[in-house]
């Protein structure tokens, strides 16, 4: 398998863009592998500029839940493009997608469309602070909520301490309004509320942590968040940018039966086009301009192409879609465990709907500290060999893999065999 054209393309890209990319993970640095430039996709497959074919488990980092080049989505996008790409005014497409989102997401009575997941979480925190009149936000270690300043925060020296900047350029003054506690740890959360409860506006959480490699909530964790935030008058915010419509037909909140006050969405609701959204109770959402005084705006918010793609994507998902994801996930999980056991390599497999995470450790993995015990060197070696086998995986141990309705049992069986072949060469 040749990567010659991708290597040359990256050399040129590095002269034009920082690191040659427009999002750091695309540089493949964490797996010490040359970046792969893609050309096109079809169904469950993706093709690079060297002509190599891969079974795709990245799916544009989650949005392509129907696979590449879904014909219904493409056809409706052609119709939308023929009418124009953006108008700076409202369109019927916004109403259609909003109605569908409100119908399926238990917590959302009103929704505001934006252009990215980062924008959704940023605006949601502003809304939570404005609504409650409080300043502090609690987030969980290992949960990623986009790259806004107040969320690029790591934990301090102890449990439930005020945050410290996790990136140059984030002022300490902003970081000090973010409290970071371990994921799946209600005791630490209670300590934070006991110390700062009167000034905590909200708790933001990925109901399934998708940016430490897919870590589901332990039993009672999400309900505990709901109970504690209710007790202290803080808002519970679910960041479902990744989990939205991937964990279940009614998102993670429907699957786990816990309803937050506010929800952030993205990825799947754009069907591969740039989009984000946030929504919640009418009482809270009506604090946003032009009805309320909390300002939020966006030139391309509710873009008709993104709204069309999102609507046509969600309209094809049914409860049966998630039964299909579970059936494929069962086969993949069983196959992975058998192959890794054959080669005497430890593996932990975590699943949530169409999201699957595997860790090269003994497990269990319920938080960021446990995820960090994975064998990162082995992961990098395996990643390179899997690419040679024609399987495109996320180039990071701390990113989940995704299934689509376009994936088949044959894809899964080929993937299991590819892992067997790869491990045979490196173990």
Curated annotation (Swiss-Prot):
Keyword Protein biosynthesis annotated: no
Keywords, in A-Z order: Cytoplasm, Isomerase, Porphyrin biosynthesis, Pyridoxal phosphate
Broad class of the protein's primary localization: cytoplasm
Cofactor: pyridoxal 5'-phosphate
UniProt KW Isomerase keyword: yes
InterPro entries, alphabetized: 4pyrrol_synth_GluAld_NH2Trfase (IPR004639), Aminotrans_3 (IPR005814), Aminotrans_3_PPA_site (IPR049704), PyrdxlP-dep_Trfase (IPR015424), PyrdxlP-dep_Trfase_major (IPR015421), PyrdxlP-dep_Trfase_small (IPR015422)
Alphabetical GO biological process terms: protoporphyrinogen IX biosynthetic process
NCBIfam families documented for this protein: hemL, PRK00062.1
Name assigned to this protein: Glutamate-1-semialdehyde 2,1-aminomutase 1
Organism: Staphylococcus epidermidis (strain ATCC 35984 / DSM 28319 / BCRC 17069 / CCUG 31568 / BM 3577 / RP62A)
